[in-house]
Swiss-Prot record:
Gene Ontology MF terms: glutaminase activity; pyridoxal 5'-phosphate synthase (glutamine hydrolysing) activity
Protein name: Pyridoxal 5'-phosphate synthase subunit PdxT
Disulphide-bonded residues: none
Pathway: Cofactor biosynthesis; pyridoxal 5'-phosphate biosynthesis
Gene source species: Bacillus thuringiensis (strain Al Hakam)
Positions contributing to L-glutamine binding: 47-49, 106, 134-135
Amino acid sequence: MVKIGVLGLQGAVREHVKSVEASGAEAVVVKRIEQLEEIDGLILPGGESTTMRRLIDKYDFMEPLRTFAKSGKPMFGTCAGMILLAKTLIGYDEAHIGAMDITVERNAFGRQKDSFEAALSIKGVGEDFVGVFIRAPYVVDVADDVEVLSTHGDRMVAVRQGPFLAASFHPELTDDHRVTAYFVEMVKEAKMKKVV
């Protein structure tokens, strides 16, 4: 069984743990740097990206997270997690982890009162997935090797680049675990490659 960490500094941690377990993997809430060595993949949950960055800095997580990204182990960022993974953020000089060759606009769908749900078609996952968007970012631009998995209107809301997966929405806030299951499969495949 693969072991998937959920960065436990802030955000929808419990919901991700439940979704990982429902997808047949072991979930670990990561609160200490050394726990990164024990896991096969990592979820960066949605929350408030500025607060999350402050906590990442406070607990000296940034370099270990960048090292984890370079190790080739899969990472999945939802909402604020997508912002953490992006190489370029509109209106900001520096990236956070910067592992994905994508450009992201924060709060692109508006403030909290503009939160909404939308039925999405997600490549590799299926149709009619209910995307919960809460002050969501979206992907403005991608490198050639980034696969766009889903759009809402003309906006890219789910993308994959090798071992990295990012979504504007909160898949953990529904009882539909297909997006998490897709990430669990990515982690299993990556672990199999390491074994071979």
